[in-house]
Every structure is written in structure tokens, then in C-alpha cells.
């Protein structure tokens, strides 16, 4: 049985070094029926998780996670990260937090990402972004 600390360390290294060709290694880290959730996806199972990451590599140039803090308490880890990538020649950069649950075998049974999709994506869309900026400004006053 793998220790959860070792599982977390391996998971962090995988995410920081992940490339499209590494997606075949997802079963080394995720339980068969693991759940992955972020602001755009809520999927269950390695095949569906693979599709989420495959899509990320299709739509973004050089996506990269840089993990700068991780805390493990029992079977739950909280991981703070920076994400960078480019889409249509526009550079993306944002901070996020992941809550990751490990099972008894050291595999991820749940990975939930928290980050502000409205600021990172929707605010940059021409029509929707203008509306959201207007609403945000009105709410601030």
C-alpha cells in the first residue's frame, strides 16, 4: 500500500510535468470511478477525465500547472497552483485550488478544482465580458 503523502508527491510531479502523451498514465493516479470537477466539467471515470485533459491540450498551447503549496490531512489534500497557457495567442494565467481525496490504495477518488472562471474566461469574451464588467462595476458601487 502506498502512503498518501507519497501518492500526493507523485500526483504533484505528474501535474507539473504533464504533457499530452502522459495522459496514458492517468490510471496510475486516479481510481477507476474517480470524480473530476472544475468550473466547466463534472465527470466520473478515468476515460472521462482523460477527455477533459485531452481537450485542454487541444485548445491551449503549452498548458502548465505550477504547484506552490500542498497540505495533506488524513486522506484529503489541498493544492494551490498557478496555471498558464495560451489560447488564440492570448496568454492565460490564473490561480486555483484543488481539493483531492485519496483512497486506501493511494489513488485519487475525487479531484475538485476551484478557480474564478468568470474572471479568467467570461470577462475576456467581447459581449459577455462587457455585460459582466458592467454588472461587477455596478455591484461595487
Residue positions per predicted region:
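Soluble or luminal CAZymes and related metallo-dependent hydrolases
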Residues: 6, 48, 92
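Short histidine/acidic/glycine/proline-rich micro-motifs that form metal-
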Residues: 13, 40-42, 85
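A beta-strand edge to alpha-helix "cap/lid" segment located at domain peripheries
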Residues: 58-64, 68-141
Amino acid at each position: 500500500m502506498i502512503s498518501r503523502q507519497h501518492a500526493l508527491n507523485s500526483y504533484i510531479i505528474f501535474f507539473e510535468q504533464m504533457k499530452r502523451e502522459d495522459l496514458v498514465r492517468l490510471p496510475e493516479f486516479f481510481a477507476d470511478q474517480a470524480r473530476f470537477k472544475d468550473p466547466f466539467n463534472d465527470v466520473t471515470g478515468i476515460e472521462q477525465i482523460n477527455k477533459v485533459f485531452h481537450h485542454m491540450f487541444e485548445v491551449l498551447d503549452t498548458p502548465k500547472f505550477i504547484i506552490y503549496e500542498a497540505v495533506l490531512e488524513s486522506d484529503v489534500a489541498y493544492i494551490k497552483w498557478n496555471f498558464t497557457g495560451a489560447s488564440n495567442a492570448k496568454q492565460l494565467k490564473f490561480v486555483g485550488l484543488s481539493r483531492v481525496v485519496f483512497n486506501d490504495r493511494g489513488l485519487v477518488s475525487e479531484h475538485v478544482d476551484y478557480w474564478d472562471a468568470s474572471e479568467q474566461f467570461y470577462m475576456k469574451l467581447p459581449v459577455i465580458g462587457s455585460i459582466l464588467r458592467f454588472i461587477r462595476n455596478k455591484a461595487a458601487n
